[in-house]
Amino acid sequence: MSENQTADEGRFSSTEIRILGALIEKQATSPESYPLTLNALVLACNQKTSREPVMNLTQGQVGQALRALESQDMTRLQMGSRADRWEQRVDKALELVPAQLILMGLMFLRGPQTLNELLTRSNRLHDFDDTEQIQHQLERLISRGLALHLPRQAGQREDRYTHALGDPAEIEQILAARQQEGGARSSGGNVSEERIEALEARIAALEARLAELEG
């Protein structure tokens, strides 16, 4: 898929999405043990931390999903004398730069997230300077149909972003909720949201001032 192509094809199951996210993460955080054996990949998929939702996949489920992903050039099996290992090919298949690959991996593992959450959770994976850098890369992914921008809903303070490579029915639900939320905003007032934004801006300014004084 080139930079100008979109993700009209190649939707993946929740198991396949979890596998891709786990491979991307372990490539960045555990290069000494990457590519992963099937057993190591199952453990990575079923981690109880940094996973939303937590899953309980079997070796059979992961193995079957890996073969399906391999047929779409999203994973590759490396045969070894001691053990076979699997690697991700998402960056090559979708022609992603490293920053985009990490963001896709985070969204594969944890679903919709705010810019600040992506910045915090990527600190061991990629060196983003700020949320503006993340937003720039997300906008490029959105333009190619690989990610979605989700306006904040009631009770939320920030917009969220998620990948667009999952089950089409789930994506349709997200888009429908997004459209409904947008309609509600255009017909109603945003006084409370504007006040929250003003308070957040004031807090950010105070934090920046405090950092200057401490420096």
Curated annotation (Swiss-Prot):
Any coiled-coil regions, as ranges: none
SUPFAM superfamilies linked to this entry: Winged helix' DNA-binding domain
Signal peptide: none
InterPro entries documented for this protein: DUF480, WH-like_DNA-bd_sf, WH_DNA-bd_sf
Domain of life: Bacteria
Pfam hit, one: DUF480
UniProt-listed HAMAP family: UPF0502
Entry's family note: Belongs to the UPF0502 family.
Protein name listed in UniProt: UPF0502 protein PputW619_3184
